[in-house]
A protein has these predicted regions:
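Extracytoplasmic cysteine-anchoring/structural motifs
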Residues: 1-26, 33, 40, 45-50, ...
Length: 203
């Protein structure tokens, strides 16, 4: 079993987002202003005492530790801003994917040799079963992963194959691909795609 990792940079996502982003305005560790949807502050000026603040933006009504397919993506970001007397200061927060993405694929050669297969991917926060020919990506909090492949060959013999994925980082897409070489040995390849999935919050 081989594990290959490469990093593929991708361009920054732009445009309008349907993601609901909440926003906290924090001073000295205390939230002094909260909105469930940052767009409610568009065009609004905030009058604040001078000082240093933290503007924190994050996915509303979601759990950063959730595991699963659609709807589980969690975005977060923060920036410091210094408020000065008689100075109007715009603020921009870049919200990035706070989890990793995982997808599972199989080569045509693999599919020809096995009539049934599935892959369970899990970490300390939960697990996702990638059933046969599942094409969606799942979201996981960034922590070491274990991928367990269960398969049945054309002779009706069943096998399992486990592999650990370490040094897992947020904002990366881990694409797991299973293959069978001409010599009959299995290959386990991982391509790491440094997907940004950025949302820009400007107030």
């Amino acid at each position: 079993v081989e594990l290959n990792k490469t990093v593929i940079p991708t361009s920054k996502a732009t445009g309008e987002t349907t993601e609901k982003i909440a926003l906290d305005l924090i001073r000295d560790g205390e939230v002094i202003r909260h909105v469930d949807d940052w767009t409610s502050l568009k065009g609004e000026s905030l009058l604040l005492p001078t000082g240093t603040y933290v503007v924190k933006a994050y996915s509303a009504d979601k759990d950063v530790h959730a595991v699963g397919f659609e709807g589980k993506a969690y975005y977060a970001g923060q920036t410091d801003v210094k408020v000065e007397k008689d100075v109007v200061k715009p603020v921009e927060v870049s919200c990035k994917l706070a989890q990793c993405m995982v997808s599972v694929k199989y080569s045509d050669n693999f599919k020809e040799n096995f009539k049934a297969y599935s892959c369970e991917v899990k970490n300390q926060y939960g697990s996702v079963e990638f059933v046969q020919d599942e094409s969606r990506s799942a979201y996981f909090p960034a922590a070491d992963l274990i991928a367990t492949l269960s398969l049945t060959n054309t002779d009706n013999k069943s096998f399992t194959l486990g592999k650990s994925i370490t040094d897992v980082q947020a904002q990366y897409h881990y694409s797991i691909k299973y293959d069978v070489t001409n010599e009959g040995t299995g290959d386990f390849n991982i391509t790491v795609d440094q997907t940004t999935h950025n949302y820009i919050v400007s107030i």
